[in-house]
Amino acid sequence: KDPLQAERALAEGHCDLVGIVRGQIADADFAAKARAGATDETRLCLSCNQECVGRMGLNRWLGCIENPRTGREAEGVGAIRITPKPKSVMVVGAGPGGLQAAIASRRNGHAVTVFEKESQAGGQVRIAASVPNRAEFGDMVRNQLAECRRLGVKFEYDVGVWPGLVEECRPDHVIIATGAEPAQP
């Protein structure tokens, strides 16, 4: 699942070789990052089996909920296009959608600030990660936050967004990523 786990298995003599597939689906640079010792930057597989194993036999392209480019590399999905005219971008919501919007905007050269009404990022994924045996869903947010930090995305926690704040901040663009409310059983 992660480079440290693979190294540990080798060091303890449990195996002579480690094959990692889903880890490289989640992060195409998995091996290069492991070799460079950049394990904190590695996007870890969530073990969800949704878009990789879950698509087997369905005659659909390979995908990964952690990596929107997986299976679409040739289409240019997620390709970085640095803008010659950077804009200020306000992202409202720090769930997975908001974090991914922030990452994409920042990679393309824009100045990004994420506003989150809660004291921490994650949105509904925090609920999914609390289900027994599904804690790895929290890795998605951890991975996205690590990428946001690396890129220099700014965060404002415990700040709800209202029209007055948008007028005060005067961003060039606003991305609303406030997610959904959990369904009542």
Please provide the spans of the model-predicted regions.
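Glycine-/small-residue-rich beta->alpha transition segments that form the dinucleotide
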Residues: 171-173, 177-184
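Short, hinge-like loop/turn segments at secondary-structure boundaries
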Residues: 13, 35-38, 130-134, 174
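Glycine-rich, histidine-containing beta strand-loop boundary motifs that form or position
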Residues: 22, 159, 178
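Short amphipathic alpha-helix with an adjacent loop that forms part of the alpha/beta core around
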Residues: 163-169
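Short, structured coil segments at secondary-structure junctions
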Residues: 13-14, 151, 170
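Flavin-dependent oxidoreductase catalytic cores
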Residues: 1-92, 96-107, 111-112, 120, ...
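Beta1-alpha1 glycine-rich phosphate/pyrophosphate-binding loop at the start
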Residues: 91-158, 183-185
